[in-house]
Amino acid sequence: MKKNNWIYIWLISLSVLLGIYFLSDDGFYSVPKNVVTKEIINTKPENLSSQYKPSIDINNQKSPEDLQNGYEESIAVVLPIPGEPPISLWRPPLYPTPWAISPNDHFYFSRPIAADEINWPLANYRYGYFFPDSDIIHTGIDITARRGTPVIAAAPGTVIWAGVGLYYGTYNEEDPYGMAVTIEHDFGHKDKKLLTVYGHMDRIDVEEGQRVETGTQLGIVGNTGFSTGPHLHFEVRLETNSYFRTRNPELWLSPPQGWGVLVGQLKNIDSQFINLKEVYIRNIETKQSWMVLTYASNNINRDEYYKENLVLSDLPAGEYTLSFSNDAVTYKYDFNIYPGAISFISFHERTGFSSELPPLLSPKEWDNIILTDDFLP
């Protein structure tokens, strides 16, 4: 009998130790609900412990009647329960703006969502993609955020639009942007004005003609206009406040410190852009992976220098492999991402890959670029 008692005591002690372990900082962590696997992969392992805390079932308590009636239950290990999305996964602070290592770069804008929130592009709604089940081109990036999250100015300037009707240029409750703000900034690029757009807000906190600084609250994230859920639609426009004058915001938003941006140009054997192609990026050292689509159409505004059809920002500096398949052939190319810089890759189905930069445009060539109210080919 005594021997059996010692066995019971030993088993109970072991259960207690296991319970303590599984609820400790070294134990299991709950993965927040709706966090994409890619984002988990892109988080440094040593930082996961600060992001995902132990899950403890505080509701698993017994009433006094249960205790008086001799209610007994073995110590249970509480499995993680999906929680709310984290405020932000680990990311370094941004480079100060304006930031440009080369004369071809123009990281002039800070993020329109503060650093304590998710403030990077939603992977499935990048610039140049088609809206789902349509042939309408997405002319900005979408940043997922909780409803009510402050939307802030990406750079100093003057509010030239605040309200509903941005696309039509006049009040229209059916406007796809919903409640939106446009800022004309104090600076330009190549003697052309720069503007930024903030769409789908639930509330606007500024008015037309108002002066704003970097970080001024413009309103709050919402779900107005053509939107399937709360998020911020952000655009960069060149010269005029027109849907047809957009550029890829990922080439204009300052990257996190120590991180860089991949810019690509993929063409087929006929020298035509390869559209809507899945391109995979893999960090050789950490094995982290990303997938980005090339632009959906030839009729999309590209950077005047890079003439890209692929952009993937916020990549930690390091060695990478790019791969994609076309006409049953898989192509691979190793390249480097450098801190605070753009890494350019071109591919032609006839000649293969190259990391050689495009030739510089002369001032005369820049002046000859035609700006029309239609997408440039």
Which sequence ranges carry the predicted segments?
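Short, acidic Ser/Thr/Gly-rich low-complexity loop/linker segments typical of extracellular
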Residues: 285-309
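Hydrophobic single-pass membrane-insertion segments
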Residues: 20-34
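Surface-exposed, glycine-biased beta-strand/turn segments
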Residues: 45-179, 186-188, 214, 227, ...
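N-terminal Sec-pathway targeting helices
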Residues: 1-13
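Short histidine-centered loop motifs in beta-beta connectors
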Residues: 146-148, 152, 189-215
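Hydrophobic core positions of the immunoglobulin-like beta-sandwich fold
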Residues: 198, 312-313
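Conserved, short, structured surface segments that act as functional micro-motifs
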Residues: 171-185, 208-259
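A residue-level detector for short acidic-glycine micro-motifs
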Residues: 161, 200-203, 220-223, 268
